Each structure stands twice: as C-alpha cells, then as structure tokens.
Amino acid sequence: MKYLYIICVLFWNITVILVAAPEKAQVMELLEGRHWSLDAEEFHSLGEGTDRLLIEISADKSLINYLRFRALEALSLFPSENTAVFLESFADNSFAPLARRGFEALRRGFFKTQPKRVKKAAVRLLKHRNAQVRISAARFIRSVDAPRFKHFLKSEKNSWVRKAAQE
C-alpha cells in the first residue's frame, strides 16, 4: 500500500509539472500566422515559464527573424527582472532590427513600472551605431525628457535622423 501511495504521488507531481510548464511548440504556434497580432490572454494562458521560452526563441539565431521579432514583442507582456535584463542586453548588443524591437518591447513592458530603467536604456541607445535604433530611442526621450532630446538633436550628425526623430 505504501508503494502505491508513493507511485501515485510521483505520478501526480509529474502530471503537474507537465501541465504547468508550456512547451516550446505551444509558444511557437502562438508566434506563427500570416495575420499575427499579439494576444495577451493567449500568452498568459500558457502559464509560468512562457517568458523563458520567449527569451530562448528571441535569442535563437537559427530561427527566421519574424518569429524572433514576434517573440520580442510578446516579451513585453512579461515584465520580470529576467525579461528586463534580457531586453536591455538585446537592445545593446543585437543587430539593428532586433535591437530596435528589443528596446520597443522594453518600453512597452516596463515604462509604467520602471520608467527610469527604460529612460536609462534609451539614453544609452541614443549613441547606438545604427540610425534606426537612435531614432526609436530619441522618440521615446522626446516624450519624457525634452532637454535631453534637444541635446540629441544638436549632437546628431545626420539630418535625416534628426528629422525622423521629430516625426
């Protein structure tokens, strides 16, 4: 009888683990589709661990970029410390299209709860080597720190970047 009880407990624990953690395939399925839109309820319904899978997908260079872009966008739904650190690092170190989307996900996911953190990342990105990333950061700075935005306009070398940042 004791062994039956132990087997039942083990089976229950394994079942809970399998049900609780989302599979990568489930997350990938939510990222696919021709007319994709971010559905917060769908992603949150996958439960705990979804953010870790989205980070894994975002960082996977073997995947096609549109899946990585969508994974970054979905990460904005999971405002944890782990997500913030990943998005900050991603914005600083990735190639331009991913860096810009990483910053935009950071802005969407953390501006209400950690505005100073987002501003700090944006200030760093004002000096990014890619113009599109600088434009994205400058547009954010324009909305939160007018003097710093004016300083950016004075220091930016490319006139088209200055113009785009003001649009």
Where are the language model's segments positioned?
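Structural detector for internal amphipathic alpha-helices that build alpha-solenoid repeat scaffolds
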Residues: 28-48, 66-80, 89, 100-113, ...
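Short inter-helical turns and helix N-cap capping residues of alpha-solenoid HEAT/ARM repeat scaffolds
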Residues: 62-64, 94-97, 129-130, 157-160
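Classical Sec-dependent N-terminal signal peptides that target proteins to the secretory pathway
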Residues: 2-20
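Amphipathic alpha-helical scaffolding segments comprising HEAT/armadillo-like alpha-solenoid repeats
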Residues: 21-28, 47-59, 80-92, 112-126, ...
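Short, flexible helical or helix-coil boundary motifs
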Residues: 11, 34-38, 61
